[in-house]
Structure formats: C-alpha cells, structure tokens
Amino acid sequence: MIASHMIACLFTELNQNQVQKVDQFLYHMRLSDETLLEISRRFRKEMEKGLGATTHPTAAVKMLPTFVRSTPDGTEHGEFLALDLGGTNFRVLRVRVTDNGLQRVEMENQIYAIPEDIMRGSGTQLFDHIAECLANFMDKLQIKEKKLPLGFTFSFPCHQTKLDESFLVSWTKGFKSSGVEGRDVVDLIRKAIQRRGDFDIDIVAVVNDTVGTMMTCGYDDQNCEIGLIVGTGSNACYMEEMRHIDMVEGDEGRMCINMEWGAFGDDGTLNDIRTEFDREIDMGSLNPGKQLFEKMISGMYMGELVRLILVKMAKAELLFQGKLSPELLTTGSFETKDVSDIEEDKDGIEKAYQILMRLGLNPLQEDCVATHRICQIVSTRSASLCAATLAAVLWRIKENKGEERLRSTIGVDGSVYKKHPHFAKRLHKAVRRLVPDCDVRFLRSEDGSGKGAAMVTAVAYRLADQHRARQKTLESLKLSHEQLLEVKRRMKVEMEQGLSKETHAVAPVKMLPTYVCATPDGTEKGDFLALDLGGTNFRVLLVRVRNGKRRGVEMHNKIYSIPQEVMHGTGEELFDHIVQCIADFLEYMGMKGVSLPLGFTFSFPCQQNSLDQSILLKWTKGFKASGCEGEDVVTLLKEAIHRREEFDLDVVAVVNDTVGTMMTCGYEDPHCEVGLIVGTGSNACYMEEMRNVELVDGEEGRMCVNMEWGAFGDNGCLDDLRTVFDVAVDELSLNPGKQRFEKMISGMYLGEIVRNILIDFTKRGLLFRGRISERLKTRGIFETKFLSQIESDCLALLQVRAILRHLGLESTCDDSIIVKEVCTVVARRAAQLCGAGMAAVVDKIRENRGLDNLKVTVGVDGTLYKLHPHFAKVMHETVRDLAPKCDVSFLESEDGSGKGAALITAVACRIREAGQR
C-alpha cells in the first residue's frame, strides 16, 4: 500500500516536472490577460483602418461591406432555396420558414460533387454543372414551376458591391475554373440558368459562410450580431453602424461587415507576439506573409504547430530521449484532430501514446504528459487570441450603441470550436475576463451556412415586403406639385370668402380686420408699455423706440405668473391682478405714476371692432375667469386701472401674436407685410387692400388681416388630402372638426400624427416587432421637440434610439430608421402645406397690386419653424415653387409678440400725431 502510494507521488512529481519544462520552453506562447488586452487594442485600430476610406486600401483587416443590413427578427416566412459552395462538394437546400406564432424552419438538402475536371475547366462548365444540379434538386422536390428566391453562400475571396452582386477576386481551395476571376458570380449563375431555360429563380443574396453563421443563429436569438468561424480557417463578421462604413454611401442603419480577420498582423502588428514556430509555419505555407493571424489560431495549422514544437524539443533532447522519426519530420503528420484527441479528459494521455507510436516514436510516460501540455498551450493560445479579437468587436458594438452594459450573442461554427474538447470553454472564459461589462452568449450554428444564406434571403424579402407596405401608407402623406397648387388655389378661394361681407359668416378662414393700417417706417420714437398675455405666465415690457442715428429698440421686461385661482376666479380679480403686476413693473423700473401708451398682445379668440377694442369670444388654454366672454378686454383693463387710482395708461392697441410678429420684423425690414407663426399652433396675417376688406368701411389704404388660417378645411375642402391619421387626431382632440389645417401643420399635433402612424405600423407587424407598448398608446408622448431632435442631421441613430427609449419605446436600429422616416414625411407635409398657404397669401398681395413680380418679406415666429432642422427649408422651397413671380424673404422674429404690440402702439401714435398736426 505504501509502495503504490510512493509510486503515484513519484509519477505526479515527474508529470509536474514535465509540465514545468514545457511551460518554460513555450513561455512566449502563454499569453497574459495584459498581453491579450494589448492585442485587442491593436485589433480595434486595425478595424478602424479597414473601415476608413483613406486607410482601407492599405489596411490588413479589410472590413468588407456585405450589404446585409438587418438580422432576422423572427417574423420571416416563406420558401427559399440556398446554394452552399465552398469546396469540392456543394449543397442545394430548400428552406421553409413559418411564422404562425411558432418559429419553425424545415430544411431538405442534397450534396453534389464537383468533378476535378470541372473545377479546373472553364467557368461556363462549372456554372452549367451547378445549374444542372439545381435543376435536379428542384425536379426531385417537384418545385421547378415555382420562381423561388435563392441565397448563395460563396466562400471564396470576393469584392461585393450589392447584396446580389459579388466579384470573385481569386480562386482558392483547388479551384481553377477559367474566366471567372474578376466576374460577378451571381451573373454567371443567372446566365447558366437562362441557358437551360427549364426553370427560373430570383437570386436575392450572395454571402460568405461567416455571415451565413450569424444569420442562422440570428433567427433563433435576435441578439445575435456577431458571426465567428474557427475551423480549417477563421473569420468573423458583425453588425456595424453605417455612419462608420466609409466605402458605402449613406449613414443610417447598420450593415454586416465581413472582417477577414485572418489577415490581422500581415502588416507586422503582431511581430512581437509571433513565435519562431509561427514564422516557420508561415514560411512553409502556400501563402507566406499572408493570413498570419489565421495561421496562429485555425485548425489548418494547429496540429502542424504542435509537430514543430515536438521536433524542436526532441532536438534539444527535452523529449523522446533526443530521438526523431521520419514520420515526425513529415509536414502535416500531426493533425488538428490529434490535438483534440490528446486533450480529451478521459484517456488523453493514452491517446497521446498511440499517436506518438503512430509517428514512429517510442514515448515514455513523461513524453506523453509533455505532448498533452504542448497541445494544451497551443489550443489555449488559439482560444485566447480569438477572445482578444472578439473582445475588440464587442467593445466596438458597445461603444456604437452607447450602452454601459452590452448584451450580445455570437453565432459560432467551425470544427475547432465544435470538436475540440476545451476550446469553446476556454474562449468563453477569456472573452468574459477581457470584456467584463458585456453579457455574451455563444450560440452554435447547427445547420451550416446554407441555412444562413436562406435566412439572409428571408430577411431581404421581409424587409422589401415591409418597406412596400410602409411606403403605401406613407404615400398618402406625400403631396405632389399638382396637389400643392390645388391647396394654394383653395386657400385663395377661402380667403376671398372670409373677406366678403356676404360669405364671411359661413367662411372657415375668418380674415379678421385688425385695424392695424401701417407697418413701421423707422420714424417711430418714444417709450411704450407692452402687455403680452397668452398663457399662465404673462410679460410686462418697457419698449424704448429711438429714431435717427440712434435708431433701435431697447427692451426691459419682467415675467409674472397667474395663479390658478385667479385664472378660474372672476374677471375683476384677473384684471386687478394684471394691473397689480403693471404697477409692480413700473415701480421696478423707477417709473411709478408715469402715464404711457400701451400695446396689448391678447392671444385668445376675439372679435376686433377697432384698434383699441377687442371682444373676447371664448377663453382657451385653461382660463375660466367669469364675466369676460362677450366683453371688450380693453375696457376691462381700463376699469381695473381706474379702480387702482395709482396711474393712468393710454391703451392704444390690442393685437394677436401673429400681427405682433409682422410688426416686430417690419421694424427691421420695410418690405415685411406678412406675419406667420408655426409653433404649437399656426396662423398668418398680411397687409390687405382696404377695398377688399368688406367688413370695414373705407376704400383707401391697407389693413392687416388676421387670417385665422388654422380653420382652413373646416368646411370639408381639404377632406381629399386628410388621411385616416389626421381624422383620428382630430376626433380625439379637444375641438373635433375645428382647426383642421392647424392640426395638419402645427407642432401641437404633428407628434400625434406620428404616434398614430407608428401604432398602425406596429399593429401590422411593420415596426417594433409587432409589439405595442402601453407607452405607445399614450396620447401626447411625441412632443414636437422630439420630432425636431429625431430629424436632426447631426444625430446618429444611436441617439434616436435613446430618445425612443426615453419615451419608453425599445427599438432596434431598423425601427429607428422607420421612426425617423415617419417623422420626416409628416414634418415635410406640414412644411409643404404651410408653404402652399403662404404662396396663396403672397400671390394675392401681388395680384392686389397688379404686379408682374412682388418683393416681400414674411416675419416668422414659432418653435416648429425655428427649431425643426428641415421645416423652414422645405417651406421656403414650396413657396418658391408655387409662387414663382414672388421674391419672398423670411425673417425670424427674435423678440416675440410683446415688442410687436409696442411697435403697433408706436406706429399708431405716429399716425395719430401726424393727424393732429
């Protein structure tokens, strides 16, 4: 008993000595995590070089675009063919994908051989043979009469220019068919099929095996965005942001990049990591200096690396008592399968003994232990190097997405990964150590790259079908030149109706006289008070207008809030509160007791009977002060001033915010005769000839008309242009049937139109994977500011996704593109409709004056116009297009409607003084 224990201890000690001896000899092959992180950093730099337009030609890691723009989302369905060509045998598959609540993939396939004389014959012979095998397969399945979509896995070096266009760079794997290199392989297959004439197929996609692996696994796990192959060769692919792929136009969405990572190090970046054994393997290979990384990790070279180490250690008399055999000295005699067998847990040492005996050696126990350790070090290095480059890919995806923690799946195939007893486990552990902030799942591809080619095709078909369905819906929101001209014509008709005494009562576009009869001429001067009331806060302003050399406007203002109990109390309480705030402001400005002319911007629906008289028709915006509706707001204000008996004010003018905008801009530009607001709401005003304003006596001069154009279409004249989404938004609004034009163009409603379209798309499975979140059902979540942010040119889809996430909407990259497109279409239509309305206004001014050409400026305010990245540009283009005889400039109002009220007051005072003289 004691003797056997001593023998066991002796053996253990001998084994440990052998392991230490090997570890020392192969010190440079045992890579620390620090070294692996350095390799990962270098690989990230190589990835960037491959993606960059200027650095791509000289980059070792080529980062080739595959034109695969999306991974499966589980809703794919249909019947597809796949062709898998990458060696002396090739497979033809029929893949049926069903999506009836249960994802299912059914496959039938047949393997066909390619005789050597065809491999080395002409390209025509090769592709005719492939077409013949395809015909044979379709005959067997009795599907020749169908025109099925086909995906083609073509595992040779190619230059891909489209999803269905791939030019062979060079043959490998023993193929030498003439007349194929430099040609599009898809075109060659199509021509071979046409030559037969007995069937037809639709070749949708050509991919390599790595992409096929990612797509196969992507169907089972929608987080799969990386494909990895570690077999005879090694490569990886992943989904990259389009904005980083300089070789392909466009910066929205993602595209799968075929990395061709086997060439990492071909430019010398791994020289300090490569060992003498790596250099020897490279020197003896068919392609010296090429695919250096692949030669360190793939199955084609792993066994040979072990053989070279055994030879070197034997020569150094560290193994086999210094003896060599002819078999051990024969290149390729130690296979990668031998490495896997020796590393088996159960009988690895026994397997080592058998393999070494096969190689003509007479190994001792310690030789077998040493060989086992050599295999372990070589395969561990391979897994570690793979992990380092994968870590770089994961880090890049994480950076691209801007996530603190990435959750991702890697689809894997290849004999080394699948058959080596420990490779997969070592790879997984190393990846998790190198990128601890990534939750990585590894998913084995069980069905090969043929299924992957079919999945690429299925995804392409799904995307095309969904795109067609979405475009059909969005088409109803896209307006042609003729439709916009018709909107302009109808607006002009409605304007005439509103101006006419006979039809004014029934006209939706009310064309209200404002009694503002002139715009600033630059001679205005004096101090004026302005009051700007249009919400829960209001402003009191002191506006100092100077003329002559010191011409300009100086403003001081203070914002006051209106408590809810005052908003809902009596009219007296409301106007007493306003006067109290005016008194406070005058004291604040050191002007207590001073009497000044006052302009009053009052942004509620009113009927104006003179410049200083405005009857409140109804409260809006949450105001409910009693005793005000039907009363003149100027009188109510004056009565409150008299009750206070502290100061007196000369209320000269009461205006709405649109007129205020025109007057503010009119002070800067004498050509400004139109005011436009496109913000939460929308309205316009312009200077009309008095002879056309039938509601006011007098024929001479001009008067500003407040169009109240938001009600355009309330009589049904826009019904043919309104979509189901416009109708839905209108029906659920606070004022159904009212302000229909405003609901198609203003910021308050555009987000709701977008939300309704997104719900429709989601219900039809065209967005958010068909899952409607509670958040999406919430009215009002899409504020105008989000539309503006989403459409911003400088905003990447990453930020669009962040905005959607903030709204509680989990989206894919494809979803983000769709949401952005919907926002673009809705905002563009709004800008075009606004432009059509404005074209009607400026053309009317031109016709009023009998001019061939009109030069006019439009003063504009409103958040949608100012903050949306494209609204203003599209609106300007539309006006130019629809009113070619008008030279229209647009001037943004910078100081709001309060300054405008003061300027109207200043103009009125100027005219009044001139009349007195």
UniProtKB/Swiss-Prot annotation:
Key word Cell membrane present in the record? no
Gene behind this chain?
Answer: Hk2
Q: Which CDD domains match?
A: ASKHA_NBD_HK2_meta_rpt2
Signal peptide from the UniProt entry: none
Enumerate the residue ranges of region (Mitochondrial-binding peptide (MBP)): 1-16
* UniProt: ATP 2 binding residues: 532-537, 680, 747-748, 784-788, 863-867
- How is activity regulated here? Hexokinase activity is specifically inhibited by 2,6-disubstituted glucosamines.
Reaction(s) catalysed (UniProt annotation): a D-hexose + ATP = a D-hexose 6-phosphate + ADP + H(+); D-fructose + ATP = D-fructose 6-phosphate + ADP + H(+); D-glucose + ATP = D-glucose 6-phosphate + ADP + H(+)
Q: Domain description from the entry? A: The N- and C-terminal halves of the protein contain a hexokinase domain. In contrast to hexokinase-1 and -3 (HK1 and HK3, respectively), both hexokinase domains display catalytic activity. The region connecting the two hexokinase domains is required for the catalytic activity of the N-terminal hexokinase domain. The N-terminal half regulates stability of the whole enzyme.
| Hexokinase small subdomain 2: region residues | 521-655
Swiss-Prot/TrEMBL keywords: Acetylation, Allosteric enzyme, ATP-binding, Cytoplasm, Glycolysis, Kinase, Membrane, Mitochondrion, Mitochondrion outer membrane, Nucleotide-binding, Repeat, Transferase
Segment Hexokinase large subdomain 2: which positions? Answer: 656-895
Protein's UniProt name: Hexokinase-2
Q: What is its EC number?
A: 2.7.1.1
So what family is this one in? Belongs to the hexokinase family.
N-acetylmethionine occurs at 1
Q: In which pathway does it act?
A: Carbohydrate metabolism; hexose metabolism; Carbohydrate degradation; glycolysis; D-glyceraldehyde 3-phosphate and glycerone phosphate from D-glucose: step 1/4
Annotated binding of D-glucose 6-phosphate 2, by residue: 532-536, 657, 680, 861-863, 897
Q: Which residues bind ATP 1?
A: 30, 84-89, 425-426
